[in-house]
Amino acid sequence: MSRSSPSGKGHSRMAEPRFNNPYFWPPPPTMPSQLDNLVLINKIKEQLMAEKIRPPHLPPTSASSQQPLLVPPAPAESSQAVMSLPKLQQVPGLHPQAVPQPDVALHARPATSTVTGLGLSTRTPSVSTSESSAGAGTGTGTSTPSTPTTTSQSRLIASSPTLISGITSPPLLDSIKTIQGHGLLGPPKSERGRKKIKAENPGGPPVLVVPYPILASGETAKEGKTYRCKVCPLTFFTKSEMQIHSKSHTEAKPHKCPHCSKSFANASYLAQHLRIHLGVKPYHCSYCDKSFRQLSHLQQHTRIHTGDRPYKCPHPGCEKAFTQLSNLQSHQRQHNKDKPYKCPNCYRAYSDSASLQIHLSAHAIKHAKAYCCSMCGRAYTSETYLMKHMSKHTVVEHLVSHHSPQRTESPGIPVRISLI
């Protein structure tokens, strides 16, 4: 550069300022391969610093991938558009941000993205987002909005991907960007909030799945609780299912008595009923010679000998007690003085006569002698009384069988008269 004479020193400075000299302001590079030596050294230093703070899950870069980064540009190309670092620092009043940056796109891409082209853009120092400059560089640049990053992250992004995109080939760039499924800055941050579960759908977009189970409305079963059928050993998880199953026992009674038309839900009830026909009384009283078919009947009879009356009247002033619960319930109805209509058979009381008449009709059916003997014609209110009566005919059965022409069935089977 030629300096002006002392006589025209002030005029030459005004005509040609020293900072407008092409020595300090080289033309910007037009191709990524024309990076100046200063930018190359700074990028290599920043990349080495990024290697020191690299996360432990990323392996160190191989020598083959670092070798192209250490190759300086050709002397012919660098002589036109390079300047050394000491000369730049000696110039007073020159700001650091005035250093021309390479025309390379600085976009934060995900780890699985691929580079489709060289997006050429200029990065401003104070703004994290970059814009494409289609007129300054080549005409192949495409504008892509970048993700806002912090100062440290933008420095790391500008250190390695920018330099690699200008020197290495696209296949090698893709392999470096996707080391172990992570980017150069490590694994991506996990999103806050509830994660949405997406089902894999290879033929179309991902299908959204609700991340919590949908419970059906209605009765739900409690944990660890089961309901057992009272007739059979089956168990159920809900009470409603057990009740539905219990109806099958009440409606269908498969155990039928061979001596009469009765049927029962289980075998134990049938065995208890067969004692009436067979006359078996396995429960004997220890105080007398009486025997009973059921244990409950023996217990009620034993209270007569012991004088035990466990069922006491709770009404104030009444000291009566009874051996059976049914007798106590009949006695308690006598204390209902607000119901003047009382039943003469069971001491029940009602507030009106219509209710009493309905109750008396039930007594008429209950005390009706529906069980009739086929040999002598006598009738009884219960089948038990009829069986006791039938035992008297066993002695002269062979004689009576020849003198009863109206008998239609065998003498051992009772006939029940249906009431209308």
UniProtKB/Swiss-Prot annotation:
GO terms for cellular component: nucleus. The modification Phosphoserine is found at S404. The keyword DNA-binding applies. Residues 1-28, 54-80, 115-155, 178-202 are annotated as: Disordered. Residues 121-154 have a biased composition (Low complexity). One of its GO terms (molecular function) is DNA-binding transcription factor activity. It is found in: Nucleus. There is a cross-link at K198 (Glycyl lysine isopeptide (Lys-Gly) (interchain with G-Cter in SUMO2)). SUPFAM superfamilies: beta-beta-alpha zinc fingers. InterPro entries: Znf_C2H2_sf, Znf_C2H2_type. GO terms for biological process: regulation of transcription by RNA polymerase II. Pfam families: zf-C2H2. The modification Phosphothreonine is found at T162. This is Zinc finger protein 362. The gene is ZNF362.
